[in-house]
Amino acid sequence: MQSDSRQAHWEGVYTKKGENEVSWFQENPAPSLELIAHVGATPASAIIDVGGGASRLVDNLVDRGFEDVTVLDLSVAVLAAAKARLGSRAAQVQWIVADATVWEPVKAYDVWHDRAAFHFLTEECDRAAYVARLDRAIKVGGYIIIATFALDGPERCSGLPVVRYDPARLGEILGNSFQLIDTRHHTHATPWGSDQSFQFSVFRRMSGGRS
């Protein structure tokens, strides 16, 4: 899918549906928060939530005193909703409207978090473009936390096909500069009560990249 088409799709989703009317909504992003703590992130760590949308991860990070938080999403509408929810706290966050496959990072991050964005990239060229941006944006010693549908997870979401992953396949895509350090399976309950199987994979950058 081309970047313009991808953006149009998600603008349509977020202008028609409320925050808790999408399957990936979480009142409490506990798995992500646990892994961010697990990798040793501190309030001074630079964290980017890629495809963050209206996720409440940003609220929790700000409330915990994190001072360098960025949320990237290609939907203007969903970031506006997130800012409105945060109120005055929104000023403590860097907001980027961009497609992660064409965005050009201007700084380096300690933690790259992506829950339920990467698995929508079904074409190899888009995955390669995403990884190229990630490669330029993560410090040596930094961490990548990616949550995708697991191998037994859904094959489609929000009207689009997805790619399901296990940690080994993600490692192949990321390349030898990244070392797998943790994996966790998570069963997510959608707002309407169905279960979705997610795979959280955590990688550390061992070489290359920014310092």
Question: What are these language model-derived features?
Answer:
Residues 116-120:
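Short catalytic micro-motifs in class I SAM-dependent methyltransferases
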Residues 1-107, 121-137, 142-211:
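Class I (Rossmann-like) S-adenosyl-L-methionine-dependent methyltransferase catalytic domain
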